[in-house]
Amino acid sequence: MEDFIYYNGKKYRKGYTTGTCAAAAAKACVEMIENQEEVSAVKVTTTGGTILEIPVAYQQFSEKKATAAVQKDGGDDIDATHGMWIFVDVELTDSPEVTLDGGVGIGRATQKGISVEVGEAAINPAPRKNILATVRESLGENRGATILVYAPEGEERAKRTMNSNLGIIGGISILGTTGIVTPMSDEGWKKSLSMELEMKRNQGLDQIILVPGNYGDDFVQNTLGFASDNIVSMSNFVGYMLKETQRLAFKKVLMVGHFGKLVKVSAGIFTTYSKDADARAEILVANLALLGAPLSLLQEVEKCNTTEAAGELIEAAGFTQVYEVIAQKIKARSERFLKFTKPSVEIDVVTFSTERGLLAATKDIEVLREEWR
């Protein structure tokens, strides 16, 4: 696919989704049955309305059945499914109905709360509609077919995705809101985080623990001893996920994370990528100064590359109260961020250090344990 975007001055090639792959393979199958000859490429309209010519990597056909495969091309966005083959079988039937299912390597939903019903193949609504429409257009109104999408590498590749967190077991999902993969875009990632949050809400939870990643997850379960059922990753998208908790009407949010990540939120930085915003040292220096720390400590902390290194200096100088001050500021900033939209969300914060463990919490830990057990 020769379409590009520019990001930070660099040129990146776009790609196409697993949903577009499946639609293209399905169309190739119908064309092979119709014409009784192999098809090297097909033109498909993506879910977003873009017309693409997609190469077909594998072809096999008989009078009423065909198999085709399309290799997933994520462009310069090398995700978990990039390069894998998405296979489709299409078989003509005597019924006018067109049906779609997933086979080997396509995950199955095992929990309520996502856009796929429990027991169904993990083919999301937009690509499902697109695949069915593509086949229907090729067949006409009076003929029917069964469509089976499968991916021999799917179960292994799914280990690199968030599917297990969403209760999708046994393989990958067939995805694609627009059908196009845009490199350097966070939208797909954010959508998957939202899906997990929606699933928790649909299961009846009204309070949630947001963690930046695995460190936070481990700390919640292994140090604090809280249940894992309430945990959802927010990655670097703190502001986005806070807004999502409000949209979904969660009553309480507990943010638990490494101090080096959450300290940024105390200064109003709600997307915590280091490439976008850092300011860890500056935030620490400013808060230490307000506590009356000596200039020599401020100068040494300002030189530190990590909050772990700064922590040694802060502890030695007896200014560990700075962590409590900053934790309260994280809470205040987060609640202010949601202030002008209803419903209100109660937010608490726990921060920790890899070396020193628990640093600060906006409530007594035992009170939090009682609330979140």
Swiss-Prot record:
UniProt enzyme class: transferase
Record InterPro entries: CbiD, CbiD_sf
GO annotation, biological process: anaerobic cobalamin biosynthetic process; methylation
Descriptive protein name: Cobalt-precorrin-5B C(1)-methyltransferase
Gene3D superfamilies linked: CbiD-like (3.30.2110.10)
Superkingdom: Bacteria
Pfam family, one: CbiD
Pathway the protein acts in: Cofactor biosynthesis; adenosylcobalamin biosynthesis; cob(II)yrinate a,c-diamide from sirohydrochlorin (anaerobic route): step 6/10
GO MF annotation list: cobalt-precorrin-5B C1-methyltransferase activity
Keyword S-adenosyl-L-methionine on entry: yes
Parts of the chain that traverse the membrane: none
E.C. numbers: 2.1.1.195
Family recorded in the similarity comment: Belongs to the CbiD family.
Catalytic activity: Co-precorrin-5B + S-adenosyl-L-methionine = Co-precorrin-6A + S-adenosyl-L-homocysteine
Keyword terms: Cobalamin biosynthesis, Methyltransferase, S-adenosyl-L-methionine, Transferase
